[in-house]
Amino acid sequence: MLASSCVSTNYLPSRIYLLSPPKTQDHLLIFLPGRRSGIHAFESHGTLDILRSSGIQADCVSVDATLSYYTDRVLVDRLETDVFKKAEITGYKNYWFIGNSLGALGAIFYAQTHPGKIKGIILLGPYLGEGPVPDEIQKSGGLLKWEPNMDPGKDSIQDAWVFLRNCITDSTGNFPTIVFLAGQDDRYHQIHSLVAEALPADRVFWAPSRHDWVAWKAAFSEFLHSETAKKLFSKQTLQQPK
């Protein structure tokens, strides 16, 4: 169970990183940190440098989405008010989440409630829940064969997995593209494999190490320098179906 902390959730702080200031790019990456990270994690671990050296034409905003935003159930509203409304005024065309650990669930929660708004979600060492839902998926023979046993809205983790499956199987362009990055020895590897096995191979990037920034940096770098990233972030993909 997630424990709350005494932090005000009336506003969601963020920090913007422009690729070529004062000009803004067409793509905006929104970094949602993990439970033990924070607003500076994307920069302090060198991930921002990897983005800038990759040639990908995108700006980035890192948000201070601490655990309290989840336990208070205000993350989605705060993202909309404090991040996306400002970004829309700026004129960004495509929005991508980088959901790190718990931030992966945050990205999914937002995308679920804002259909068609998010172009893609990069799952970076994602935390996707534990317990009965992943167990059921595994026993069913994988995500694409699984049938949820609860009605929608009864369990947020089940709803998140249903949404992931819809993203993966979608052919209309109405759901976000999913890219998966993680460590080969992550403690959630068994759960991660349920996602990775359902995705096209060119959208899955494993790296040595565990649930840590050693793995995440390596996998992020491999992805950004791949043909997959070049296609996803090219001018031709702007506002086009997947």
Identify the residue ranges that each predicted region occupies.
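The feature captures the conserved acid-bearing segment of alpha/beta-hydrolase catalytic domains
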Residues: I16-P21, L143-P200
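Gly/Ala-rich beta-loop-alpha elbow adjacent to hydrolase catalytic centers
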Residues: I98-A107
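Conserved alpha/beta-hydrolase
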Residues: L51-Y69
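Alpha/beta-hydrolase active-site loop
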Residues: Y70-T90, F109
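C-terminal catalytic histidine-bearing segment of alpha/beta-hydrolase fold enzymes
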Residues: R35, T71-R73, D185-K242
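Short, surface-exposed "cap/lid" segments of acyl-processing enzymes
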Residues: T9-S53
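Hydrolase active-site cap/lid region
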Residues: F109-G153, W206, W216-A218
